[in-house]
Amino acid sequence: MISNSVIQIGIFLVVLMACVVPLGRYMAKVYGENPPLQGFFGPIERLIYRLLGIDAKSEMHWKHYALALLGFNAMGMLLLYGLQRMQAWLPLNPQQLPAVSADSAFNTAASFVSNTNWQGYAGETTMSYLTQMLGLTVQNFVSAATGMAVLIGLIRGIARRSTSTIGNFWVDLTRSTIYILLPLALVLSVTLVSQGVVQTFSPSQTVELIQPIVNADGTTISQQTIALGPAASQIAIKQLGTNGGGFFNVNSAHPLENPTPLSNFLELLSILLIPAALCYTFGLMVGDKRQGWAILATMTIILLGFTVLAVSAEQAGNPLYQKLGVDDQASALQAGGNLEGKETRFGIVNSALWATVTTAASNGSVNSMHDSYTPLGGLAPMVLMQLGEVVFGGVGSGLYGMLIFAIIAVFVAGLMVGRTPEYLGKKIEAFEMKMAALIILIPCVMTLLITAIAVSSESGRATVFNSGAHGFSEVLYAATSAANNNGSAFAGLGANTPFYNTWLGIAMLVSRFWLIVPTLAIAGSLAGKKLIPQSAGTLPTHTPLFVSLLIGVVLIVGALTFIPALALGPIVEHLLLSL
């Protein structure tokens, strides 16, 4: 099984790395003076600017950039909220689904606008086709484009010197959508349709079962209702944009959302495709490709470590089964391991790899149920989120988060040798460190605060369906997921309540936009600084030494913050299994 695991993970990484250079180079050109494919995309881009009255040549101060971004996303949230509340009276609702409740609509609007895609509802029984397409799918595009725009603003701040502007938000948003996200989503959605992913406006179909079954109360069930809908178009961008919200309740474990091994591989690859390629884009835009490779190496090493942990823990199986004499070890006749909550068509390796990739990348989609993982298997995706979603992370947001950690790393290195820290020729001073501290602390505070409120209040405990350490893990996972804009969940928590919808919605908004503003502030501050020539005392930020330092900073800051909480959840649960 070890060789099988290595081969499957190796193929995935090889294909991913093969896509980094061409896509990264293309995206660097998109954000340059003369983007590619202007003959096709140029007229569409110019038409949008003309209709909206945008001066594409006018650049913005970081404060104006932030105001435009916040205003755009606030309007998007209001529209999505209103669409959900009115869906019962709108077309493309063949199942005649009622309006979404106020608290659930708020939570969903906050979730999709913040690129979290946390879902406290079941998509096929809650959202009409119009809401899925016009509301959720549109936000999948623009929330991803928002993250990419912030990243490009930060990169410009690092690369430029003695200027007060970092670009134009409207141009960056438009180009991210038209030149990058839409073409990739179109290709992927058509490919997914070829694999059997549904794309139709037909209502749900009731079919006769070939083999009727008798349920627990003795009733014979001879029919099944199969949910349909325009799923492929939403699934493509939910993966490419690291959104993660599924069309169906069980997300990519659903046979009509992820039917074949090829669809599984393509959806998995799509999660990391843009975040990985943006590292190369970063290197090109700052004039040193080695910087991009160093960041990519850091992300890949951390991801591999947690993937090995998850695969090993799941393949080892459940100690409780072994005590009962159940054989769950790999052999010629069975795959072995902990297959509870997993699709046998994907197996342990593809399930555990997806679990770590989706939580490393702030995607949150699932092809297995994380709540059914072993304690250490569930700890791996939880910790990847708690690191701040910087191990690849969301499109744009992951890389700008890792660049903040890089700034902290050079600051720590500067303290150790008594030099003023600098990153890519720019001095890192008090203002940058204050903003970086905010970016690091806000998700941690929100995670621990919401966990504490939930476990200490009757409303929070009422829908925790497991007791003890695992029940605590479910609450901690939900708070971690919302506060780090991931969206995955331990499904044993009943989260579609006013309590969780409200608190998790607040966490998603705070952790998204309270991080974006200080990131843009750092971009503006760095853009106004002069370039410092390199000297013998300059810390190279492209070497294996710096990669090791950066990994250490990410792990120490993330791990130390949450060790007490993890000790009450997955760690103690693991120890109890061994008793």
Curated annotation (Swiss-Prot):
Gene Ontology MF terms in the entry: P-type potassium transmembrane transporter activity; potassium ion binding
Topology class, membrane: Multi-pass membrane protein
Domain of life: Bacteria
GO cellular component, one term: plasma membrane
Subcellular location: Cell membrane
Alphabetically ordered keywords of this record: Cell membrane, Ion transport, Membrane, Potassium, Potassium transport, Transmembrane, Transmembrane helix, Transport
Residue spans crossing the bilayer: 1-21, 64-84, 135-155, 178-198, 265-285, 293-313, 398-418, 435-455, 503-523, 549-569
Family: Belongs to the KdpA family.
PANTHER family found in the cross-reference section: POTASSIUM-TRANSPORTING ATPASE A CHAIN, POTASSIUM-TRANSPORTING ATPASE POTASSIUM-BINDING SUBUNIT
Functional summary from the UniProt entry: Part of the high-affinity ATP-driven potassium transport (or Kdp) system, which catalyzes the hydrolysis of ATP coupled with the electrogenic transport of potassium into the cytoplasm. This subunit binds the extracellular potassium ions and delivers the ions to the membrane domain of KdpB through an intramembrane tunnel.
Assembly: The system is composed of three essential subunits: KdpA, KdpB and KdpC.
Protein name: Potassium-transporting ATPase potassium-binding subunit
Taxonomic lineage from the root: Bacteria, Bacillati, Chloroflexota, Chloroflexia, Herpetosiphonales
Gene (name only): kdpA
